[in-house]
């Protein structure tokens, strides 16, 4: 059973610093993120937004500071104390990470359905029929044509690829999703549609998100 307390932060960051050259990146960042809350990180290109997301999600360990996450089993835990295996488990189950370029977050040569089902298989899903059904449900949630379930993402438009990547990340019902400028590479009209879809999904699923 989850120990999540709605009055306790899901994520607590204190004094976080991470740079890529000793100068540029993020410096002394502190914030709390509560269940169901959305935090938008705003800044110019190269200002350190992606670096911050990588440090908070422990894809790149910070140079200083701490990141604590409210795990289901132990409550707030400092990510620095977790093993690589435990961090990988969190990334597969409780977290999602939507990358700016959808091609970096998808397997481009396997089917759309397999991309979604693969994440379910990583947490124990094995029944082919059930996996396919859930994948189809998420295709429809993301306003993707169910008839494209067996098509490879390489044949999709950029906007479709991004929606597929989001489905792949949300299918395991994570509590926290990191989104690294998910609309930056899309046309303005596609951006608006995707942002509206994201707003509805975050509200419907009660996700916490950093965008």
Would you name each region that the model predicts?
Residues 130-147:
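Conserved ABC ATPase "signature" region
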């Amino acid at each position: 059973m989850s120990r999540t307390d709605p009055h306790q932060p899901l994520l607590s960051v204190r004094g976080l610093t991470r740079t890529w050259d000793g100068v540029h990146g993020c410096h002394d960042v502190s914030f709390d993120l509560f269940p169901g809350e959305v935090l938008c990180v705003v800044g110019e290109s190269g200002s350190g937004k992606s670096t911050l997301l990588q440090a908070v999600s422990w894809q790149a360990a910070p140079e200083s500071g701490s990141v604590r996450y409210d795990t289901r089993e132990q409550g707030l835990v400092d990510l620095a104390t977790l093993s690589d295996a435990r961090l990988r488990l969190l990334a597969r189950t409780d977290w999602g990470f939507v990358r700016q370029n959808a091609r970096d977050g998808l397997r481009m040569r396997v089917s759309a359905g397999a991309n979604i089902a693969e994440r379910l298989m990583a947490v124990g899903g094995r029944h082919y029929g059930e996996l396919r059904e859930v994948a189809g449900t998420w295709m429809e949630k993301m306003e993707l044509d169910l008839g494209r379930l067996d098509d490879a993402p390489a044949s999709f438009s950029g906007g479709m690829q991004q929606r597929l990547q989001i489905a792949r990340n949300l299918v395991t019902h994570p509590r926290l999703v990191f989104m690294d400028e998910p609309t930056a590479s899309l046309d303005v009209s596609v951006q608006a549609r995707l942002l509206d879809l994201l707003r509805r999904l975050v509200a419907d699923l009660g996700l916490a998100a950093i965008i």
